[in-house]
Amino acid sequence: MKVLEDYRSLVHGIGSLDFSGDAVPCKLLLTGDTAFPVLVTPRKDVLIAASRYGKGKVVVMAHESYLNTNAFMDFLKNAVSWLSPNSEANIGVHKGLNLLTDNLSANGSKVQNTSTLIEGLGVFCTIGYDDSQDKQIISFVREGGGLLIGAQAWHWSYSHKQENVLHHFPGNKIISVSGVHFTSDYGEKGNICVMENIPQAPIYTSFDFSLDQKYLLKGMSQLDISGSSIPSDLLLHGTLSFPVGLSENKQCFLGATYYGKGRVVVATHEGYLSKSELKTIMLNAISWLDINQNRRIGVHKGLRQFAELLQKENIPCNISSLDPDLSVYCCTSYSDAEAKAIHEFVAEGGGLLIAGHAWYWSSQNSDLDVLIQYPGNKILNKFGISILDRTIPGGNYNAINPDESSQQYHFRRGLCNLQAELRSGAEVKPPLSIWMNKLRQDVTAFMRLPANPIISSIQSQFVEMMQICEIPNVTKQCPVSSCSKEAFILCLAQECFNVCDESHILEKEPSITVEIDGTNPGNNAWRSTGLYLAPRKTAVLEFPASAVHQGLQVQVGCQSDDLSSADKYCRAPVVVRRFHVDSQRVSVSCFWGGLVYITVKANSNLGIIPVKVYEAEPAPIYIKGKTSLDTWIQSIRNLPAPWAELITENIILTVPSDAIRSLSDPEALLSLWDKIMVAITELAAIPKKLPRPERFVADVQISAGWMHAGYPIMCHLESAKELTDLNIMQTGGIWGPIHELGHNQQKTNWELPPHTTEATCNLWSVYVHETVLGIPRSQAHCCLQAETRANHIQEYLRNGSNIEQWNVWTALETYLQLQEGFGWEPFKQLFKDYQSMSGIRNENKSKMNLWAEKFSEAVQTNLVPFFEAWGWPIEEATHSKLSVLPVWEKDPMKSYLSARKSNSN
């Protein structure tokens, strides 16, 4: 690692450095992505730092007297050697640093005494109280020069109380471009040991941003981000970043930061820049960014509306790309073409207003990491801000109170507070307890940030912090609150044990070779390997070269529900991990363990892929028509892996292994499931072989309900028996599982949400129970008994056939009456016809009229009176079109309407 080599060059032969003299150092603040601490005190004060800028290097001392003190000379000689672009470089030394001059000269260096930067120098050694040459020194370093500088800012701050030390202190006007700052805080003194490896940087340094927030929020009591624009959330991970706009849940849609000599404001939707309700804050932002009020504003061509807004406010601006002569540049986050130039522009004093969201990019680039590869983050990560793929609900949010800035959520502050709480063992108290959910989300994102010395240091400190904690043993009987310290540990365990150690694995013979079907005409699909990876273990998978970079992923675990929004956890919220197959050898691990899958993206045509797998163990897997029943009974069902799979052509059941230990005839069970799935496809009018088999996965906790649809369909552990017990299925039925399979067949073109969301899926439940299981609808579910059905209809009519009350069983009744009158064939025909229809308006009234029309035509009967009895808003055009057909003489609603009319008389 290059930075470690740099560090060891600087401290070579140095055991300790004595800061116990009269000089009082200041703390140094590190913010840049190339800055690293060289000397850190026990109290975590940085007293020496180094960095790179452009082609050059910088070493910073926390007091100028250290440049002229015997105790530091060996270190300073190392520093000058490291800073020198070559061994023959001329060294310029400030005239007051005679001891340094003598020592460098005695060491064979070519030294010139000078109080200013002059031509021909390779290294310049100076003190940080004169900024008259700041631009020249910055240019000198950028082009490859070395800078050794010492100063402290605490004394200066006494006589400049109204000025911002980070921005106005002379030394900071020189070194801040490198991501190192002098501060007004006293540093710890003493004889400090030099570490063998780079010392850890402080996690958090407190700064008061209240004046900046007041400036930016002047004239704003609320921030209105309602409307169609959906913003992303921001991760403010830099020490000098701060929130400007927050939702009620502390999600940040507007943030700002200092970087080098410049400033940055980030909005997470470009539409906000020209949104009338936010005009005041955007104008404030332009003014805040334009540090010297030069009013040279450049606006990228993608933000023409914002340029027009500025011009209407008499703020001069031009449509342009980035120009170093601008004072403020405004652009979107959707391109990184100017990233390098933007970094230099801001570091050297420019202001950047950048806007855009990342959620759409992430949805279109699901195999890429938004934190690393999203264009905007290639610009912003360096500044200490990242745009996330998480969205924020629109709304009219109260402006934050700058006077309460010390109590505002800040990622680094929260992490520092958590460290103290974990060490103390005490219960988490406000405000940290209020921040825990947001902090957990931010830590998860932060741990994925690209490495640099400061980020890596904080990441490693977090890992150390977590590794001293005991992982809570949560169960359904012993859950933990989502806001608790235990929940935080549970959620982040994977991030802290994210180590794939393959060093010992490849010496062994391959344990198993599996063949994966890489052809997938359906949506993204999981292919079972039949293998299980134990918790905290590492497996290695070897793919043929033809399978690399084809969108394949290795997935460990199948309980894919994210429970992060739950109030309590019976398991960690995320227990599935995925790894891109971007090389022939892929190492995988998961803190929680799990079954191993290869995911094949939609419309892949890769054929059969042989995969060698090291260190995973066989799981109890039965494949209908392939697995020997004798082998199943004798050995497979007794394999120790905790999860089992039962696989047939159109469905895969994943259940606890304990649920199948006594299963002696999986062939008969799966034969029944085959019949069920054929019935599912029959009613849906789709081919009997699904392009992607359905999946059921049992879990101790799921994200919604007793079961929920999707891929996979998730259910509670208690449902495993319902899925795998042939007797239960044949005698009592399985309404719930078929209900979820029905959900997966609902289509937007004929669905009428929210009314039929929990209704039409039950058509499949009725169909399967009657045609496959031989269980009539009145026995399949208690709500379909004749008396209960009649009560649903009567109550609905009694309330005036209000379509707002047409839901679930009442809505299902409409479809059941049609089925009982005309059979299943019209449904099958319509479901088939709808598959080839286009241009259907996604609006319920229009879809109701279309269904009434199509069903009437399918059965050659005018069903308008029937649907109107149910309160459907049938239009005159539909009336007219269907009037040529005979009315439904056996309309079941007639008797209910007649009875109601008689009762009213």
Curated annotation (Swiss-Prot):
SUPFAM superfamilies: Class I glutamine amidotransferase-like. Gene3D superfamilies: Peptidase M60, enhancin-like domain 2, Peptidase M60, enhancin-like domain 3. It comes from the Eukaryota. Residues 524-823 form the Peptidase M60 domain. InterPro entries: Class_I_gatase-like, M60-like_N, Pep_M60_3, Peptidase_M60_dom, TCAF. One of its GO terms (biological process) is positive regulation of protein targeting to membrane. SMART domains: M60-like (SM01276). GO terms for molecular function: transmembrane transporter binding. GO terms for cellular component: plasma membrane. May play a role in the regulation of the cation channel TRPM8 activity. PANTHER family: EXPERIMENTAL AUTOIMMUNE PROSTATITIS ANTIGEN 2-RELATED, TRPM8 CHANNEL-ASSOCIATED FACTOR HOMOLOG. Belongs to the TCAF family. This is TRPM8 channel-associated factor homolog.
